[in-house]
Design a protein with these regions (language model features):
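N-terminal periplasmic "start-of-domain" segments of outer-membrane beta-barrel proteins
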Residues: 35-65, 95-101, 105, 110
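Outer membrane beta-barrel strand-and-loop segments of large Gram-negative receptors
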Residues: 419-420, 431, 435-441, 487-494, ...
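Short acidic/polar hinge/loop motifs at secondary-structure boundaries
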Residues: 76-78, 105-134, 154, 179-180, ...
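A beta-strand signature from Gram-negative outer-membrane beta-barrel systems
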Residues: 109, 121-167, 215, 838
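Conserved C-terminal beta-signal and adjacent last beta-strands/turns
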Residues: 424-431, 440-447, 453-457, 580, ...
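Gram-negative outer-membrane beta-barrel transporters
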Residues: 538-542, 648, 653-658, 673-770
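Surface-exposed extracellular loop regions of Gram-negative outer-membrane beta-barrel proteins
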Residues: 105-106, 343-345, 401-404, 466-469, ...
Length: 839
């Protein structure tokens, strides 16, 4: 399939360019004055002009709020929240119910078990805007529950500009305070490992061809001789203990530029845009962690008490370049290439007691590189003489990677190195997820009776996705008498695993990779849609649409060392999904109504019956091959009132009904392995209110001030069937990660003097963070509020200064089960100073 549509792209491009060039020459002829008809009205707000319930966040809001990435910015949209600092929940629904697109193309994910790309990967510096559409329309993928997030990258420009931005900042609990550090490679400051953490050459040679690293056995004549194992063990970097030193300030740098060139005497021109964004930040946290077990009735007994201390160094490095060919105002072709990178270097130590150890010390050293690279070729063509024919096409080749080299984990029990199988580990994992996508959208306009404007639209998408995930795990095994020397086992690991202690008399390296650690997966989507909009005199609009999707997905879990062992999970669907929306416009009031039927499909690993370990959480997970696709019915109503030039108020209600919703479950009280089930039913309903109002009613005092806010109340219920309950405590509960209340408020000061000041408040209510088991209630992340302040001063036409203060109140983040604390920590207050210069 891939090669068929790849071969078709040049034909399509050449054909459209030929038509465009012909149109260009025609337009260059002597112009003729024709009748001018007014068929619409000026729409200052994109969400006002659309036929769907939506929100748009653009550059103006990015600047006002001072948000560095899209995950921070989207939580300010009504009904949206951010979980874990990077996953966006729309109307309380998790990432499985949301779709992320970039310039129309489906995005792959660098995360091993998450289908949606984390939004913290996208800096606001490279994006023009983000459309969040909360009602379904047939032009978008049918995997839709909460909404679709359409990320729009910055485009080439029609004028010259060059901007440079630099900032410094810090946190009160991190900057100039002692934190964990560990020397690495020469390119760590760029977020690239230079090979310092890579497998040694001796290890690479030993495991080449998917060979397993194990001690030679005289029985099966397989394995590696002890002298070679000794050499391999000594070749590992003997670095386990990190330093404690004062942490530096956070820094960032961004530059963007653009220009255009005309092509001869024609109306054609080439324009281009480029940007580079870099940031280097530090974050230290101390987290209290507790575990509770039933003690009779509603009383819980503490089984674990731990103190987590960690430092994270994050480096973001992104670049984008876009070049466009505008043949005239009606025809353009654009090529956009970008690379988004985020490195997280995490060092942590956990101390305390657990069920199996009264004196535990657990240390983790983790380096993760995430990258998304994209190349997109797009064309937009408008033929007004052919019933206002519009043809938009795109081809995208996008790849997401996650690389975690030499992830080290070790623990001491009672002051001695643990002899458990997982007492010391050095893991290497790599994931690549590629998507190739071709899309076509065509629309035409016709005119009917009763001043009706009929817009027909049809198109299709052919998308192919391939994922390859590999993990190799190693650890030092206890062998000879040296490895049981109690005095030695109480020393730092650099002493325990010193070269003289590696060998037949001491420790030897072995492979502990699991049979289900590695998998490949693919899915293919062939989709076609049709849509008709009836617009009666810009007063009443009806949109009817349907989307046909042919979907196939396979996931193959395999044992690297036993080719005969493998488990395949397969999912197929061929379905038609309808969508309907209506808008009634009465002067400055709009009333919207929408209904649609959509789906949510199981992800790659959720279907596979092979047990695997989530490399991000360490949780044991096994899929369910009997999972069914979730069917969703969506109902929406919204009223909007636009008054003044920018002021508006809107209020809406929504209701969603789920058949066979997919939920996490724990089936066994012994091994507590997570799996997935189809719950009996689920409902999600809520109310959303938004307002933007200038405070000019206060007279001269308020004419430079505005208030912007939104509030959402969301109520959801998931019902678990008795046969699927397992050891879950609750048979009914809210959706995991869904807050009942979401609130955003902004008060801004924007005079014409070049000064801007914005006070922002974000609040989310209690939300289920983990389902309870064995009569322990569900775990709830407690309600949290964040207060930020952004001050911007334009000194002249070239210089601008921005000061930011984030999380001013520094409320404690807590997770509780009933009244018992599970974990708690302070994020810290953050301040920064930014300087912009525009040439």
């Amino acid at each position: 399939m891939r090669f068929r549509f790849l071969e078709a792209i040049p034909v399509l491009v050449v054909t459209l360019l030929a038509l465009s060039i012909n149109t260009t020459f025609s337009q260059n002829a002597e112009p003729q004055i024709e009748e001018i008809s007014v068929i619409g009205q000026f729409v200052p707000d994109e969400k006002r002009g659309t036929d769907q319930v939506s929100n748009v966040v653009g550059q103006e809001q990015f600047t006002r709020s001072g948000d560095a990435n899209i995950a921070e910015s989207l939580k300010r949209v009504s009904g949206l929240s951010t979980v874990g600092g990077k996953y966006v929940y729309v109307r309380g629904l998790g990432e499985r119910y949301s779709t992320a697109l970039m310039n129309g193309a489906i995005l792959p994910s660098p995360e091993p078990i998450n289908r949606v790309v984390p939004m913290d990967l996208f800096p606001t510096a490279i994006l023009e805007s983000v459309l969040v559409q909360k009602t379904y329309s047939a032009a978008f993928p049918a995997e839709f529950g909460g909404g679709v997030m359409q990320l729009r990258t910055k485009k080439s420009t029609d004028e010259f500009f060059w901007n440079v931005t630099s900032s410094i900042g810090g946190q009160n609990n991190t900057t100039f305070k002692d934190g964990f550090t560990l020397d690495g490679g020469s390119r760590d400051w760029l977020g690239y490992d230079d090979g310092h953490r890579a497998m040694s050459d001796t290890l690479k040679r030993a495991v080449a061809g998917d060979n397993k690293l194990k001690k030679y056995s005289v029985y099966d004549k397989q394995g590696v001789p002890m002298e070679d194992l000794t050499a391999i063990g000594k070749a590992f970097n003997n670095e386990y203990t990190f330093d404690s030193e004062s942490l530096p300030v956070d820094t960032s740098f961004t530059t963007s530029f653009g220009n255009f060139n005309e092509i001869g005497d024609s109306r054609a021109k080439i324009n281009y845009f480029g940007a580079i964004d870099y940031s280097n930040s530090w974050d230290s946290n101390e987290v209290q962690q507790n575990r509770w077990v039933p003690a009779g009735g509603e009383i819980l007994s503490q089984q674990e008490e731990l103190n987590f201390q960690g430092t994270e160094n994050s480096v973001d490095l992104s670049g984008i370049f876009s070049v466009g060919l505008d043949l005239n105002e009606n025809h353009n072709v654009r090529l956009t290439s970008l690379v988004l990178r985020k490195m997280d270097h995490r060092l942590s130590r956990t101390l305390g007691y657990i069920e199996s150890s009264d004196d535990l010390e657990r240390v983790e050293l983790e380096w993760i590189e995430r990258e998304l690279s994209s190349h997109q070729l797009q064309g937009d063509h408008y033929f007004p003489e052919f019933n206002e024919l519009v043809i938009n096409w795109r081809y995208s080749d996008i790849e997401a990677n996650r690389d975690s080299p030499d992830h080290r984990i070790y623990r001491y029990d009672g002051g001695e190195l643990s002899s458990r199988g997982n007492g010391n580990q050095r893991n290497y994992s790599f994931l690549t997820d590629t998507t190739e996508d071709f899309g076509l959208d065509v629309s035409m306009v016709f005119y009917g009776p009763a001043n009706a404007t009929i817009t027909t639209k049809f198109g299709g998408v052919i998308s192919e996705k391939d994922r390859d995930s590999e993990i190799r795990r190693y650890g030092f095994a206890f062998g000879g008498p040296i490895s049981y020397d109690l005095d030695l086992l109480q020393q730092p690991l650099e002493t325990i695993f010193a070269p003289e202690n590696i060998g037949p008399e001491g420790f030897y390296i072995r492979e502990i990779t699991r049979a289900t650690d590695n998998y490949t997966a693919q899915n293919e989507l062939n989709a076609f849609y049709g849509e008709v909009e009836f617009n009666f005199d810009d007063r009443l609009r009806f949109t009817l649409g349907a989307r046909q999707e042919d979907f196939t997905q396979t996931a193959d879990t395999f044992d690297l060392f036993n080719p005969t062992y493998g488990v395949q999970a397969k999912l197929e669907q061929d379905a038609l999904m309808p969508a309907f929306s209506a808008t009634f416009i009465n002067n400055d009031h709009q009333f919207r109504l929408a209904y649609s039927e959509t789906v949510s499909r199981p992800d790659f690993r959720e279907l596979s019956p092979a047990m695997f370990t989530n490399p991000m959480t360490g949780t044991e997970v096994v899929g369910n091959p009997n999972l069914k696709i979730t069917d969703i019915k969506n109902y929406d109503f919204r009223w909007e009132w636009y008054f003044g030039y920018t002021d508006y108020v809107s209020a809406g209600i929504f209701y969603k009904e789920f058949t066979n919703p997919i939920e996490a479950s724990i089936q066994s009280p012994i091994n507590r392995v997570m799996t997935f089930i189809n719950a009996a039913s689920a409902e999600n309903q809520g109310v959303e209110v938004e307002v933007f109002k200038t405070l000019d009613f206060l007279g001269d005092l308020g004419e430079d001030f505005y208030f912007q806010g939104n509030v959402s109340y969301i109520d959801s219920t998931v019902t678990i069937a008795p046969e699927d309950r397992g050891v879950l405590t609750s048979m009914t509960r809210p959706l995991q990660g869904q807050s009942d209340w979401l609130l955003n408020a902004q008060i801004g000061y924007e005079p014409f003097s070049g000064t801007t000041a914005t006070l922002l408040y974000h609040y989310y209510g209690d939300r289920v963070s983990q389902v309870g088991i064995e009569t322990v209630p569900d775990f709830y992340e407690q309600a949290f509020g964040e207060l930020n302040f952004v001050f911007i001063r334009e000194l002249n036409d070239n210089w601008r200064v921005t000061a930011k203060a984030k999380n001013i109140t520094d409320q404690r983040n807590e997770v509780r089960v009933s009244d018992y604390l599970v974990n708690g920590y302070f994020m810290g207050r953050e301040i920064s100073l930014q300087v912009d210069y525009t040439f």
